[in-house]
Amino acid sequence: MVGTFADVVVADAIVKNVPGFDLHVAVDALMKDSFVEPPAISGGAAGKDGLNRYTQFGYIPEDTPRAGESVSRTLDFGFADYSVAQAFHKLANTPEFASRKDELLQKAVELERRATRSPE
């Protein structure tokens, strides 16, 4: 596994109503991990390196800097996107997230499209 699966675990916990964590902090972290490519760090990769190219092409080209194992990484990103989309759909329909409903639904649809699109 070369992708980031913390977002899959958090999304699964949201969908299954697992107690014990702050949903607002979780949503903010899922938003950042799903839509912001991390800056380059010295000594290795962290987070979703290659996210911008994945978003652009629907896959991570093998020549993407800091994003080795491009096929595995592409599959991992798609799985994470779909998982997070399911969590956002669920939360969008709760009173606690009523003020963010439109944002969550828009991001959920964007993630689902990204996870299921055919490469260009």
Ranges and model annotations:
Residues 90-120:
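Catalytic cores of carbohydrate-active enzymes
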Residues 1-92, 112:
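Aromatic-rich carbohydrate-recognition surfaces in CAZymes
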